[in-house]
Swiss-Prot record:
Protein name per its UniProtKB record: 3-methyl-2-oxobutanoate dehydrogenase subunit beta
Gene: bkdB
Organism per entry: Mycobacterium tuberculosis (strain ATCC 25618 / H37Rv)
Function: Component of the branched-chain alpha-ketoacid dehydrogenase (BCKADH) complex, that catalyzes the overall conversion of branched-chain alpha-ketoacids to acyl-CoA and CO(2).
Known cofactor(s): thiamine diphosphate
Upper taxonomic lineage: Bacteria, Bacillati, Actinomycetota, Actinomycetes, Mycobacteriales
Pfam families to which the protein is assigned, alphabetical: Transket_pyr (PF02779), Transketolase_C (PF02780)
């Protein structure tokens, strides 16, 4: 391993100006790859590792070319042992490195829970902030690609419930690039959940102009009747549903892309609900105690007198993630969302 003096990570170093300082059309896979490349070029302490990330470039080719460019000391393969991957990351961070480990699929993350919950999330608090833990855990996540068991899941609620972690979910290539750059520059551990279904969606990425950092939501579509709060894969679903709602029913939906699940930008949500008076939360995971449950509870606790109707949730079912042939029936889609919209609009 390359010998680098022990010292805590400095965010300003890992968020240096991009090496490829241009605006261009990229897929999400390309945007994440570019973010990793630029972060590694900006700071020699940034290390990328995981199952098949070096020789194969990852199962989705997200890390392709990094080992060739930066060498086997900085981009390397690991055994098929997720707990070990996170344990290695914690140890490297303690020695002054900036690790970016990959868990190959969200359904493979469960063996790593002990290392994540007991050590990764707690080290900064355990040391009263004296030790940084600049670890960004990349996890291809969520459904929509017809994958086998363990290859599609919604793990975000586990991570959000683990105090000490930041949790982000990009929905566009631009967000994928900049949220990853911000995550790598952060002294706290960040769970970076990549929506697999959006991997090949294309968009403009400006690597010279930072987009909003972790903790900031974005209003993707303005509206006046109902606030739809969502993230990841379902942002595009919400936007297309909003078009349908306007064309067929003359309903005006405002769509908020959370981007950051923890910390949460509640101010943006509250400002929207002040205008609309109604809210639907949409996410892929099961309904019971899913991410939307806590968010809906907070909205109703803090904005009860601004609401014209109860907050509803359009989400997955309380079953294990289904086999590929049933996935489309299980995942929330336009029909489930618009049913919730109609129900909140029925309220007087």
């Amino acid at each position: 391993m390359t010998q680098i003096a022990d010292r805590p990570a400095r965010p300003d170093e890992t968020l240096a100006v991009a090496v490829s300082d241009i605006t261009q059309s990229l897929t999400m896979v390309q945007a994440i790859n570019r973010a990793l490349y630029d972060a590694m070029a900006a700071d020699e302490r940034v290390l990328v590792f995981g199952e098949d990330v070096a020789v194969e470039g990852g199962v989705f080719r997200v890390t392709e070319g990094l080992a060739d460019t930066f060498g086997a000391d900085r981009c390397f393969d690991t055994p098929l042992a997720e707990s070990a991957i996170i344990g290695i990351a914690v140890g490297l961070a303690l020695r002054g490195f900036v690790p970016v480990p990959e868990i190959q699929f969200d359904g493979f993350s469960y063996p790593a829970f002990d290392q994540v919950v007991s050590h990764l999330a707690k080290y900064r608090t355990r040391t009263r902030g004296e030790v940084d833990m600049p670890v960004t855990v990349r996890i291809p996540s969520f459904g929509g690609i017809g994958a086998a068991e363990h290859h599609s899941d919604s793990t975000e609620s586990y991570w959000v419930h683990t105090a000490g972690l930041k949790v982000v979910v990009p929905s566009t290539p631009g967000d994928a690039y900049w949220l990853l750059r911000h995550a790598i520059a952060c002294p706290d551990p960040v769970m970076y959940l990549e929506p697999k279904r959006r991997y090949h969606g294309r968009g403009m990425v400006d690597t010279s102009r930072p987009e909003p950092p972790i903790g900031h939501a974005m209003v993707r579509r303005s509206g006046t009747d109902v606030t739809v709060v969502t993230y990841g894969n379902l942002v595009s679903t919400a936007l297309s549903s909003a078009d349908t709602a306007e064309q067929q029913h003359d309903w005006s939906l405002e769509v908020i892309d959370l981007r950051s699940l923890a910390p949460l930008d509640f101010d943006t949500i509250a400002a929207s609900i002040q205008r609309t008076g109604r809210c639907v939360v949409m996410h892929e995971g099961p309904r019971s105690l899913g991410y939307g449950a806590g968010l809906a509870a907070r909205i109703q606790e803090e904005m009860f007198y601004q609401l014209e109707a109860p907050v509803l949730r359009a989400c997955g079912f309380d079953t294990p993630y289904p086999p590929a042939r049933l996935e489309k029936l299980w995942l929330p889609g336009p029909d489930r969302l618009l049913d919730c919209v109609e129900r909140v609009l029925r309220q007087p």
